[in-house]
Amino acid sequence: MKKLYLASNSKTRKQILDNVGLKYIVNPSNIEEISLKDDPREYCIDLSNQKAKAIAKTLKEGVILSADSVIYFEGKILEKSKTKEEAYENLKMLSGKVNIAVTGVTIIDLYQNKEITFYEETEVIFDDLTDEEINWYIENEMFIFERAGYSIAGKTAIYIPSIKGDYYNILGMPISKVYKELKKLGYQISDFE
């Protein structure tokens, strides 16, 4: 049996791995998340690489899985909203438009000395939102921990009529692609303890 280390403390990422039956050990990297990359794909890959490599330095063996996600909209990377005002501005900006959830993933296999890095993109289509709807959402949701101030798995779901791409990517872990990459390395879900 092999060990899989999740370089994240994200409840959502843990839930996704739990849902598919993937056994893992939580080992968050605790790095300061700084990237100088402007392109959202490069930005997410850079941060997922930093996290995975920080964990790899502390281990002799294992498979490390790391991810980083952002919302990309009209040439800007939108980070987690820190205030109600920031969440309001983000949701107002996204209203009636399409934004892109980008997740960079790094898998470092210390057993085979291999590394895989990829990104996934999903288009998220928002309904037109009234000020009343935005204010209701902000008062009734834990927006402060969410990229661009929203979570498709929460109350925002009522404002998102469709997506193009992987739903789980929006949540921060494109699990189908992760599984395909683990298979390329020769692993099955049941290989991890």
Question: Which residue stretches match the model-derived regions?
Answer:
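A short beta-strand-loop structural module common to alpha/beta enzyme folds
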Residues: I25-E33
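Anionic-ligand binding patches
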Residues: K2-L4, V26, P40-E193
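Cofactor-binding loop segments of dinucleotide-utilizing enzymes, especially the Rossmann-like FAD-
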Residues: N9, S29, L110
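N-terminal beta1-alpha1 ligand-phosphate binding loop
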Residues: K2-L22
